[in-house]
Curated annotation (Swiss-Prot):
Keywords: Amino-acid biosynthesis, Arginine biosynthesis, ATP-binding, Cytoplasm, Kinase, Nucleotide-binding, Transferase. Its EC number is 2.7.2.8. Catalyzes the ATP-dependent phosphorylation of N-acetyl-L-glutamate. Signal peptide: none annotated. It comes from Leuconostoc citreum (strain KM20). This is Acetylglutamate kinase. Disulfide bonds: none annotated. It is an enzyme of class 2 (transferase). It comes from the Bacteria. GO terms for biological process: arginine biosynthetic process via ornithine; L-arginine biosynthetic process. The keyword Kinase applies. It is found in: Cytoplasm.
Length: 245
């Protein structure tokens, strides 16, 4: 039976992906696994905004995105991050194709809270047919975390949230949320498994804090909507913390 795996990687991952990452991708392909990659790019966006003397502001951990900001975000993601990742895969003999929200209405979204965050959105529709067509051609889609509203406005989307939405609509078997740590740590030890009840307890006790909270919430959202397992880890070669029901 064909397995579907979605991988979310950071924006600087093209320079950091290891031979083991590419070897794992190649092995999965020999097992008839369908793979899609969602990439971030926050650091590159911030760097480009600074170079263009645009203010950088975050509210509740969410980047405030003006119309100029969304244009810069598109430049960073589609002009720098995605091409670098595609080239890194090409050098390893892995056939990919870069996609964005404008690729045949790939990701349709709506504004999250325009008064507070500007052009930041959430995804409510994924063109799964397009992704399946690319899989039939043995291509790995590499997807930028951007959405477009029904009236054509581009939106900035958190990459974890984008990967979660794509995994949900594709009914993926596995979702890997790659981060800079090897899993969810409690008292210095990496949890092998995390359930919704345990996650709530750890958050209530303030053991899980900061940037790990939205990542875990994304993982919980995915498993509650049909994704079998979500891995919070620093590499696809290690399961990390498996978030499951």
């Amino acid at each position: 039976m064909t397995k579907k795996i979605i991988i979310k990687i950071g924006g600087s991952a093209a320079e950091q992906l290891t031979p083991a990452f590419f070897d794992t991708i190649k092995y999965w392909q020999t097992q008839d696994t369908q793979i899609a990659i969602v990439h971030g790019g926050g650091d590159r966006i911030s760097q480009l905004m600074s170079q263009l003397h645009e203010p950088i502001e975050k509210i509740n951990g969410i980047r405030l995105t003006t119309q100029t900001g969304i244009n810069i975000t598109k430049m960073a993601l589609l002009g720098q991050v995605q091409p670098a990742l595609i080239e890194a895969c090409r050098q390893q003999g892995i056939a990919t194709i870069g996609l964005n929200a404008g690729s045949n209405q790939l990701l349709t979204g709506h504004l999250l809270d325009s008064d507070t965050y500007g052009y930041v959105g959430a995804i409510h529709q994924v063109n799964t047919q397009l992704i399946h067509q690319l899989w039939q051609q043995k291509l790995i889609p590499i997807i930028a975390p951007l959405a477009i509203t029904n009236d054509g406005q581009w939106l900035n989307v958190n990459a974890d949230h984008a990967a979660t939405a794509i995994a949900k609509y594709l009914k993926a078997d596995e979702l890997y949320l790659l981060t800079d740590v090897s899993g969810v740590a409690v008292s210095g030890n990496i949890l092998q498994e995390l359930t919704p009840g345990k996650a709530k307890q750890l958050q209530d006790d303030h053991i899980i804090t900061g940037g790990m909270i939205p990542k875990i919430n994304s993982a919980l959202h995915a498993v509650k909507r049909g994704v079998h397992n979500v891995h919070i880890t620093d590499t696809v070669t290690h399961p990390g913390t498996i978030v499951t029901l």
